[in-house]
Amino acid sequence: LKPDEELQGPGGVLSRGYFVFRPRN
């Protein structure tokens, strides 16, 4: 897992090692 790469997870996005929850509307 690279911190520079944005990984799309279930209900959130992994960016720079931080999991930010982004609700799908």
Swiss-Prot record:
Keyword Secreted: yes
Keyword Secreted among record annotations: yes
GO terms, biological process: regulation of smooth muscle contraction
Protein origin, superkingdom: Eukaryota
Keywords from the UniProt entry: Amidation, Hormone, Secreted
Primary residence: secreted
GO cellular component terms, semicolon-separated: extracellular region
Function: Stimulates uterine smooth muscle contraction and causes selective vasoconstriction.
Protein name, entry field: Neuromedin-U-25
Phylogenetic lineage: Eukaryota, Metazoa, Chordata, Craniata, Vertebrata
